[in-house]
């Protein structure tokens, strides 16, 4: 029988899954659920050592002989600190020492409770990875716990620290078997032909494979997922994910239905966006994608064709939609006029979501953390090292937040700004339930009545404006084609209620 502590059982199951076969265990009550589990596992041989400092080196000696990861398990408090010499030695020898420390609950740290000190990151830079496991009480926390243990155990070339806070009761051993836990596997850098062929074979042999590029051109995935609805024919069983973060929350929720995901990235980081990651391949995602595309030419896959047909229908419907005057109409017209080779920066929030639907060329956007600050400065920085026009499509809050980007003597006439001003953060009108809060407009969406005209005047920026459909096309064309040695800004004023209504109407086309 195993401990009743879910995170201890998740940890134990994954230690076994990742091939841990030896554990040095030290005495204590707080770590007793972990020690009990390790002793119960027929796959793991336990070796008791009383002195923690000595125990760390016992484990190190085993690693040197076995060339395998070995666990050293200690109780809470200074017991962990006694491992520091062995951990430092393992770090410089690049030995896979797995430190598992029991801990007191977070709320009791620094409260003069016994054997209690801040244990997360206590081993500092001498470990390659340090994680602290939550005590799960829902599916999200169980997934998080699984992910953290996997992240630690696939870390290479040095020691790792897994810290396990455990609440009382400690001595309840009523679980008959360990959970079946998802194991994440890691493949090293420099994708070999063998690895490339293996990934491609996994893709082509799956019944419903889907290749997802994090930031593709004109993906229309939001619209496609709306069209799919509850049609299970489109749900993939295997997702190959490359590239950066995905804009569409709806797509991310949809892909969490898949059975498994493989991620290809340059760093080998565990990015479990869809909560079903099973394999991390460190390497060039574009090389993998290009190889799969090449193979699909000679071996067309019916599921890929099903999705291609769907996306073609979605694109045709999107192109046929005629939005009333709104921010959507502005961006759609702008994208119909700007060249395919244009350098276009989109700010976050509503702007990038409109680009997701209507941009047919590569776009730039700060989608690392997705903040509203710095979008204009990023476009400005691009413009000073480019001999082409650089466009920035930006909402009012992002613009006013970053207006100092225009306070720079290096700016030239190749910087063109399309400012979408509806007097607030319009995306907050799209969040269901927020309309019930009287604080939404003034405090959440930052409602305002500000114009960029004065900012342009003080920074010698050519200022244009459009207030309605009668002005729009001429104003956008002027922004695109005017000859100027100074930056040009077009401020388009829309009504936030119209923007919301048009956006919802557009999405309804695909339901």
Stretch-by-stretch model annotation:
Residues 100, 107-120, 357-511:
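Thiamine diphosphate
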Residues 205, 209-262, 270-273, 360-386, ...:
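Glycine-rich, anion-gripping cofactor-binding loops and their flanking helix/strand elements
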Residues 8-16, 26-30, 34-39, 308-387:
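Active-site diphosphate/adenylate-binding microenvironment
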Residues 10-20, 62-67, 151-156, 195-209, ...:
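Glycine-rich phosphate/diphosphate-binding loops that line cofactor/substrate pockets in enzymes
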Residues 1-3, 255-350, 455, 466-511:
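Phosphate/pyrophosphate-binding active-site segments
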Residues 38-47, 64-70, 355-369, 435-438:
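Glycine/charged-rich beta-loop-alpha catalytic/anionic-binding loops adjacent to active sites
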Residues 2-73, 79-82, 88:
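N-terminal cofactor/phosphate-binding cores enriched in small/glycine residues
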Residues 22, 65-74, 80-82, 90-97, ...:
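Structural signature of the thiamine diphosphate
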């Amino acid at each position: 029988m195993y401990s009743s502590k879910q995170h201890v059982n998740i940890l134990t199951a994954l230690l076994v899954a990742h091939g841990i076969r030896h554990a040095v265990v030290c005495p204590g009550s707080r770590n007793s659920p972990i020690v009990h589990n390790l002793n119960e596992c027929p796959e793991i041989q336990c070796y008791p050592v009383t002195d923690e400092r000595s125990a760390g080196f016992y484990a190190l000696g085993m690693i040197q002989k076995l060339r395998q990861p070995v666990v050293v398990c200690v109780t809470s408090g200074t017991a962990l600190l006694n491992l520091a010499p062995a951990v430092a030695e393992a770090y410089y020898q690049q030995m896979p020492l797995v430190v598992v420390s029991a801990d007191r609950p977070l709320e009791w740290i620094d409260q003069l409770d016994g054997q209690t000190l801040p244990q997360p990151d206590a081993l500092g830079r001498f470990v390659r990875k340090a994680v602290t496991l939550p005590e799960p009480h829902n599916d999200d926390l169980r997934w998080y716990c699984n992910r953290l243990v996997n992240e630690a155990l696939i870390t290479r070339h040095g020691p790792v620290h897994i810290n396990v806070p455990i609440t009382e009761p400690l001595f309840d051993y009523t679980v008959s078997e360990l959970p079946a836990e998802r194991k994440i596997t890691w493949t090293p850098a420099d994708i070999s032909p063998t690895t490339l062929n293996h990934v491609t074979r996994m893709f082509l042999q799956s019944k419903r494979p889907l290749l997802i590029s994090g930031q593709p051109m004109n993906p229309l995935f939001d619209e496609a997922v709306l069209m799919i609805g509850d049609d299970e024919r489109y749900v993939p069983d295997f997702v190959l994910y490359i590239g950066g973060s995905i804009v569409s929350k709806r797509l991310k929720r949809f892909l969490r239905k898949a059975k498994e995901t493989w991620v290809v990235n340059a760093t080998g980081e565990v990015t479990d966006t869809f909560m079903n990651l099973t394999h991390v391949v460190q390497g060039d995602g574009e090389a993998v994608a290009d190889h799969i595309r090449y193979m699909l030419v000679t071996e067309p896959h019916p599921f890929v064709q099903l999705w291609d047909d769907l996306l073609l229908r979605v694109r045709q419907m999107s192109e046929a939609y005629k939005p009333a005057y709104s921010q959507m109409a502005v961006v759609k017209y702008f994208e119909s006029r700007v060249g395919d080779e244009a350098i276009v920066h989109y700010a976050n929030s509503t702007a990038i979501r409109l680009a997701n639907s209507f941009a047919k060329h590569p776009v730039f956007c700060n989608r690392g953390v997705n903040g509203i600050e710095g979008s204009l400065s990023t476009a400005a920085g691009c413009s000073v090292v480019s001999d082409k026009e650089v466009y920035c499509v930006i909402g009012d809050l992002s613009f006013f937040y970053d207006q100092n980007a225009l306070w720079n003597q290096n700016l030239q006439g190749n910087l063109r700004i399309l400012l979408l001003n509806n007097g607030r953060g319009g995306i907050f009108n799209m969040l269901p339930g927020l309309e019930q809060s009287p604080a939404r407009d003034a405090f959440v969406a930052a409602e305002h009545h500000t114009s960029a005209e004065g900012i342009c005047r003080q920074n010698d920026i050519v200022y244009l404006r459009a207030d309605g459909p009668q002005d729009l096309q001429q104003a956008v064309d002027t922004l695109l084609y005017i000859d100027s040695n100074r930056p040009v800004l077009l401020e388009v004023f829309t009504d936030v209620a119209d923007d919301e209504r048009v956006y919802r109407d557009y999405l309804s086309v695909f339901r």
